[in-house]
From Swiss-Prot:
The modification N6-succinyllysine is found at residue 148. It comes from the Eukaryota. The active site is at residue 173. The gene is Glo1. This is Lactoylglutathione lyase. Substrate binds at residues 34, 38, 104, 123, 127, 157-158. Glutathionylation at Cys-139 inhibits enzyme activity. GO terms for cellular component: cytosol; nucleoplasm; plasma membrane. The modification N6-acetyllysine is found at residue 148. The keyword Zinc applies.
């Protein structure tokens, strides 16, 4: 195991690698399938994630006895979504990098209801990231759509990437993967 590093410096590359194990062969078909965000108002969130960010609603699942709904979104062609419910469910759960939005019924009508985005104390969850071909063009469009920015592309020390907020205040990093090496 690597030597502990002072909190101010983080792990060295070597120390980080020494903390990692080679994946067990039994995990070769595992994939990161989804991340989940709790949402207050599905109408606002679905509009934001589809119209603003361009995701496609893959499937909606309702759980009446527990009073919540799940919405699964991803960057997929809506024409590829199977029509048969059983087939669609298996297909939706086999996609990579799916965003699951969880709506607990009634939260949209509760003015005191809000979710913690993890970027203020107590810190925890930080953000999701969306890769785009051109950060500046994407942000120009977001501005025209009235999207709330946490960081515009030329703000701060890390130029060329941005952070926007969804209707619940969750942060979304907007990045161009081909430019990240020059930013970090």
């Amino acid at each position: 195991m690597a030597e502990p590093q002072p909190a101010s410096s983080g792990l060295t590359d070597e120390a980080a690698l020494s903390c990692c194990s080679d994946p067990d062969p039994s995990t070769k078909d595992f994939l990161l399938q989804q991340t989940m965000l709790r949402i207050k108002d599905p109408k606002k969130s679905l509009d934001f994630y589809t119209r603003v960010l361009g995701l496609t609603l893959l499937q909606k699942l309702d759980f009446p006895s527990m009073k919540f709904s799940l919405y699964f979104l991803a960057y997929e062609d809506k024409n590829d979504i199977p029509k048969d419910k059983t087939e669609r469910t298996a297909w939706a759960f086999s996609r990579k990098a799916t965003l699951e939005l969880t709506h607990n019924w009634g939260t949209e009508d509760d003015e005191t209801q809000s979710y913690h985005n993890g970027n203020s104390d107590p810190r925890g969850f930080g953000h999701i990231g969306i890769a785009v071909p051109d950060v500046y063009e994407a942000c120009k469009r977001f501005e025209e759509l009235g999207v709330k920015f946490v960081k515009k592309p030329d703000d701060g020390k890390m130029k060329g990437l941005a952070f926007v907020q969804d209707p619940d205040g969750y942060w979304i990093e907007i990045l161009n993967p081909n430019k990240m090496a020059t930013i970090i």
